[in-house]
Amino acid sequence: MGSSLDLVASFSHDSTRFAFQASVAQKNNVDIYPLNETKDYVVNSSLVSHIDYETNDMKVSDVIFFGWCSDLIDTQSSNIKRKLDEDEGTGESSEQRCENFFVNGFPDGRIVVYSSNGKDIVNIIKNKKEILGADTDESDIWILDSDKVVKKLQYNNSKPLKTFTLVDGKDDEIVHFQILHQNGTLLVCIITKQMVYIVDPSKRRPSTKYSFEISDAVACEFSSDGKYLLIANNEELIAYDLKEDSKLIQSWPVQVKTLKTLDDLIMALTTDGKINNYKIGEADKVCSIVVNEDLEIIDFTPINSKQQVLISWLNVNEPNFESISLKEIETQGYITINKNEKNNADEADQKKLEEKEEEAQPEVQHEKKETETKINKKVSKSDQVEIANILSSHLEANSTEILDDLMSGSWTEPEIKKFILTKINTVDHLSKIFLTISKSITQNPWNEENLLPLWLKWLLTLKSGELNSIKDKHTKKNCKHLKSALRSSEEILPVLLGIQGRLEMLRRQAKLREDLAQLSMQEGEDDEIEVIEHSNVISNPLQDQASPVEKLEPDSIVYANGESDEFVDASEYKD
């Protein structure tokens, strides 16, 4: 797997390395995690190595492809003096070992190959043309450039091992490039906006072996036995029987990001961070794998030799890893990972701390109670069914009361998700709801009504593919207006938060000044008492003495020991 928007997540082929970066826009580095099954894939932070792109005048945000190559390295060779990482030391001696290499593809034609820990650059390959796509297979790197030329390169050599020009898809916009395997035979997958081509590069003149007319495809994979080709687009996962003239035999409604197989299991990483597992011949998914607390799976890799899958999921910008056996997936319909009681205890402690802080802020506490009352209010099942039926009928009748239905107090978040999944079955209904919500939010992005943002959130999450397929100009125009409104509110929000922070600081400063003033008043009273007592001790003896320099003023101020505001010259006084 390569990069997805702002995220880098990629397992090495042997599942012993994982490249990760949660935010390439903010950080110009990638972390390499060493993975060890004997340690249950728990990684000590001291073993994580970092690739700093800035030291070589590169930007990780420019990289369009991340992948891994692997090769058998002769450990006895005098030409290779590479120190084994501490986490890989097993005490066993062997003449060869598998070494991983981290591959980065830049759009300007550069391919930079790093060592397994990222500390060294092994090779830099420079292609004359812009790179459109890339993939890796064992020690080989396959690239597609802007001339629609496919090249096979080795990670440690700059000279291509094989080169050929595409025939099918040459004049189309290519959106995805991938290497596939069918019963041990390497094939090249070319995906355009309307077609999928599977090319056999083994012949002297590479030819197209399969072609499928399918729009907006995102990933392809052969079944483990090579009999079926699986193609995922924005709306569904489709299975074609290659023995029956590439006949479509089955499809599942799911939005897929990554597609892989393990035995007869079809594993699909969905756009909402779950793994759905399917089998040919079964209408429903066999098993769903999710992460507790609404966290997301970012990548996975099947380990065929061990009959298990290794999963990486994101927890507070750090990857966590867990392996699940094939037997568990086939026998359990639903698997939840990250069941950690300690995390729950930490959250409970944090909640208690927040509650204590809010006790000193009556306004915040009152606002919180009002919000909780709105969210946690009990809604009867009959009310939920009734409002769902009313909304469905209004969608059919094109009623003007759709907005009132969406903002009804009978809706809960689970019911909103259920309605979107089960009741919105046509593009027309989807378009009506989206237009209604987008218009209302565009007019007032700061509306305190929390139901419309919930509707928008789950529409974009569950129906993003269908929304993207709507070609209606009116819908696209409303979408642009919505983006503009949300963008302005997004820009204003940090300013408002800053003002809120300053006001809170001023409030605390005023309280501090008040406390300091009271403290100063108390100290002043104590000092006044002490000064009065001290002056009495000094002035009484002076009043008893007949000192020539002592002079009483009309205001009864006593000057002692020559302390006067008049200068007296001693010589003149003597005369």
Curated annotation (Swiss-Prot):
Disulfide bonds: none
The UniProt record lists the keyword Zinc: no
Biased composition (Basic and acidic residues): 340-355, 364-375
GO BP term, pick one: tRNA re-export from nucleus
Main location: nucleus
Gene Ontology cellular-component terms listed: 90S preribosome; nucleolus; nucleus; rDNA heterochromatin; small-subunit processome; t-UTP complex
This protein's UniProt keywords: Nucleus, Phosphoprotein, Ribonucleoprotein, Ribosome biogenesis, rRNA processing, Transcription
Region annotation Disordered: where it falls in the sequence: 340-375
Molecular functions per Gene Ontology: tRNA binding; U3 snoRNA binding
Annotated compartments: Nucleus, Nucleolus
Residues where Phosphoserine is found: 547, 564
Protein's UniProt keywords contain Signal: no
InterPro entries: WD40/YVTN_repeat-like_dom_sf
Additional remarks: Present with 20000 molecules/cell in log phase SD medium.
Function: Involved in nucleolar processing of pre-18S ribosomal RNA. Required for optimal pre-ribosomal RNA transcription by RNA polymerase I together with a subset of U3 proteins required for transcription (t-UTPs).
Record protein name field: U3 small nucleolar RNA-associated protein 9
Gene: UTP9
